[in-house]
Amino acid sequence: MGNIILLTGFQPFLDYSINPTEAIVKELNGRKIGEYEVRGVILPVSFRESGDLLLHHFQTVQPTAVFMLGLAAGRGKITPERVAININSGPEDRDGIAPVDEPIRQGGPAAYFSTLPVRRLIQRLNEEGFPAEMSNSAGTYVCNHVMYRMLDYLHEKGSEQVAAGFVHLPASKELAAQHHSLPSMDLKDLTRAVTLMIEEL
């Protein structure tokens, strides 16, 4: 069996009726990209369920890389995340839970760095004409939650050879049509950008 990459996206959330990461993951699921076979998973925007579901799929699939996607409505560039922090805080999730400054894991490390080759991903995207830059904050919402949970799990299991990290994407044009002030990119371009990043791993 070749290398498997676990590619995750999210369902729509808050007042965003479309989440482009959901469409991208569905489009790329089952594809062969570079040396990887893509296994796609759509996660709920839920502090309570998203991390457990992610780890369940990781244990089932046993991938050699984990590439997590999320929507950063308002950002105009593709932004690979450098770090995840041990905090849950934000507006109500799908379950009506709105934590305030709660640790993701009591006693866990304050932060974990992405183990993806973040700068190389950005360079590849820029070379291909995509606006991209590093982000030093994945926020404190569910995107940060799943990034932290994944990296914490790999650290605790001594499986840090598995490349894992998170990339935030701008809104798609379909979503921006509903929220006119949002910077956006075409969904096909976002899908192409994700494909390029996976090729670069």
Curated annotation (Swiss-Prot):
Keywords: Cytoplasm, Hydrolase, Protease, Thiol protease. It is an enzyme of class 3 (hydrolase). Belongs to the peptidase C15 family. NCBIfam families: PRK13197.1 (NF009676), pyro_pdase (TIGR00504). Removes 5-oxoproline from various penultimate amino acid residues except L-proline. It catalyses: Release of an N-terminal pyroglutamyl group from a polypeptide, the second amino acid generally not being Pro. GO terms for cellular component: cytosol. This is Pyrrolidone-carboxylate peptidase. It is found in: Cytoplasm. Its EC number is 3.4.19.3. PANTHER family: PROTEASE FAMILY C15 PYROGLUTAMYL-PEPTIDASE I-RELATED (PTHR23402), PYROGLUTAMYL-PEPTIDASE I (PTHR23402:SF1). Its main location: cytoplasm. It holds the Pfam family Peptidase_C15. It comes from Halalkalibacterium halodurans (strain ATCC BAA-125 / DSM 18197 / FERM 7344 / JCM 9153 / C-125) (Bacillus halodurans).
